[in-house]
C-alpha cells in the first residue's frame, strides 16, 4: 500500500499543471541554434528524421508520440496537437487536458515549440494573445509558433484597411502589440512561371522592421515547390538566393514550403521518400545558413542596402557607406516580374557601429565579381568550414555564385 501511494503521488506530480513557482526559475525561450525547418512534411519516422538531420534541418514537426524519434536523431521538435488552439481555454475540460499535455511534454529534451496556427486575421489576435500568454506562463522555455500572411494577402484576409503597405503594416503592428510573439514568422512565395513577384524585398523589409521593433527574431518561409500551374519549381540557385537574402536582412530562421505534400511538385522529397535535387543543394546551404546566422546572432541588424536594381521596399546603398563597392555598382532600371539584379548589403554590429556585413549577388542566373571596401582591415567567413580568414587589407574581391553571398567583418 505504501508503495502504491508513493507511485500515485509521483504520477500526480508529473501530470499536474505547472504553477508560477514551477516556472519562476525557468529561463524564457531563446532561439539558440538558428532554425532550419519546413512546412508540410511526412510523418516523422526514424527514416524521415535521419534524412532531415543529414540534410541540415534542425526543427521537425511531430505529435507527442514522435518526440522520442526527434530526440534519437538530435532534432528539435515543434509539437502539433488539437488542444493547441484558443478555443481550448474556453472549455474547462479541454483546458485541463491542455494543462496535462504541457505537463507531460515540457521537460522532453526534444521539445522546442508549440504550433498554434497559420495565417490568422487581425480579429483572431486577441484570442491568440491569450493562448500565447497561457503557454508562456506554464512553459516559458518553449516557443508558441504562429505564421503570418505575406504582403499579397487581401485586406479581408489581413483584417485591416488601406493600401497594401498600410494594411500590412497595421496587421504587423496589431500582431506584435496584441499577441506579443517571441518570434515573427511569415511566408512569401514569388517564383511564378511568368516572372518573380515584385514584393519579396518589401515583405522582407517590413517583417525585419516589425521584428526589430518587438526585439524578437524572425523566420522566413520560402518557396521550394509549385502547387498551381501559375507557379514554378525553383532551382538550387534560386534557393541559394532565398537563403542568403534572408541572412542579409537579419533572419534567424528559414523554412521551406514544402518538404513533401500531396498536390505539390518539387519540394525536398518525393512521395516515396527519395530526395529531390533541392534536398542535395540544401544539404550544404542549410549548414551555411546556420553558420552565418550564428555569427550574426549576438549582433543587431543595422541596415540593409541595395545596389543595382531598386525593387519595392529597397533602400539604395549610400555613396559613402562604411561597406561599399569600388567601383560603385551602376543603377539598373527595375521592371516588375523580372528577376532582381545587383547586390544586397546587410550591415550588422553593436552600438549602431557596423562591424559585419553580408553581401549577396541577387542574380540567381549568373556569377558576379565585385570589389568591396570596408571601414578597416577585412576578414572573410568560410560558411562551409566555419572559420574566419584575414584578407590583407580594407579591399576585398568578392566572387559570388548565382544568388550566393559572403559574410565579412572588420578585423578585431
PLM regions: where:
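Universal eukaryotic N-terminal targeting presequences
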Residues: 1-2, 53
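Bacterial N-terminal signal peptides
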Residues: 2-13
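Sec/Tat signal peptide C-region and signal peptidase I cleavage site
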Residues: 16-19
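Glycan-processing catalytic domains of CAZymes
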Residues: 21-376, 380-412
Amino acid at each position: 500500500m505504501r508503495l502504491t501511494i508513493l507511485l500515485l503521488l509521483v504520477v500526480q506530480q508529473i501530470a499536474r499543471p505547472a504553477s508560477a513557482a514551477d516556472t519562476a526559475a525557468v529561463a524564457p525561450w531563446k532561439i539558440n541554434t538558428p532554425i532550419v525547418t519546413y512546412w508540410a512534411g511526412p510523418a516523422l519516422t526514424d527514416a524521415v528524421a535521419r534524412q532531415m538531420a543529414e540534410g541540415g534541418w534542425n526543427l521537425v514537426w511531430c505529435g507527442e508520440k514522435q518526440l522520442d524519434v526527434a530526440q534519437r536523431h538530435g532534432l528539435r521538435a515543434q509539437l502539433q496537437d488539437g488542444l493547441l488552439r484558443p478555443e481550448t481555454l474556453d472549455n474547462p475540460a479541454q483546458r485541463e487536458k491542455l494543462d496535462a499535455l504541457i505537463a507531460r511534454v515540457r521537460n522532453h529534451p526534444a521539445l522546442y515549440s508549440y504550433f498554434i496556427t497559420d495565417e490568422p486575421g487581425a480579429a483572431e489576435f486577441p484570442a491568440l494573445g491569450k493562448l500565447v500568454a497561457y503557454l508562456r506562463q506554464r512553459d516559458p522555455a518553449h516557443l508558441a509558433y504562429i505564421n503570418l500572411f505575406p504582403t499579397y494577402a487581401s485586406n479581408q484576409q489581413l483584417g485591416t484597411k488601406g493600401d497594401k503597405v498600410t494594411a500590412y503594416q497595421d496587421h504587423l503592428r496589431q500582431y506584435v502589440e496584441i499577441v506579443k510573439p517571441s518570434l515573427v514568422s511569415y511566408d512569401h512565395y514569388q517564383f511564378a512561371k511568368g516572372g518573380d513577384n515584385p514584393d519579396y524585398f518589401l515583405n522582407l523589409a517590413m517583417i525585419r522592421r516589425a521584428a526589430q521593433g518587438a526585439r524578437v527574431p524572425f523566420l522566413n518561409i520560402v518557396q521550394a515547390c509549385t502547387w498551381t500551374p501559375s507557379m514554378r519549381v525553383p532551382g538550387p540557385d534560386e534557393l541559394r538566393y532565398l537563403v542568403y537574402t534572408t541572412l542579409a536582412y537579419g533572419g534567424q530562421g528559414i523554412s521551406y514550403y514544402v518538404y513533401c505534400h500531396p498536390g505539390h511538385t518539387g519540394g525536398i522529397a518525393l512521395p516515396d521518400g527519395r530526395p529531390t535535387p533541392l534536398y542535395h543543394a540544401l544539404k550544404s546551404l542549410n549548414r551555411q545558413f546556420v553558420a552565418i546566422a550564428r555569427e550574426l546572432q549576438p549582433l543587431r541588424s543595422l541596415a540593409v542596402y541595395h545596389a543595382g536594381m531598386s525593387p519595392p521596399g529597397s533602400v539604395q546603398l549610400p555613396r559613402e557607406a562604411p561597406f561599399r563597392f569600388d567601383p560603385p555598382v551602376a543603377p539598373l532600371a527595375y521592371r516588375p516580374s523580372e528577376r532582381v539584379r545587383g547586390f544586397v548589403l546587410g550591415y550588422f554590429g553593436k552600438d549602431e557601429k557596423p562591424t559585419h556585413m553580408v553581401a549577396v549577388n541577387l542574380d540567381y542566373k549568373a556569377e558576379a565579381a565585385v570589389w568591396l571596401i570596408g571601414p578597416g582591415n577585412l576578414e572573410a567567413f568560410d560558411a562551409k568550414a566555419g572559420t574566419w580568414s584575414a584578407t590583407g587589407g580594407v579591399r576585398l574581391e568578392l566572387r559570388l555564385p548565382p544568388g550566393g553571398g559572403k559574410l565579412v567583418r572588420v578585423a578585431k
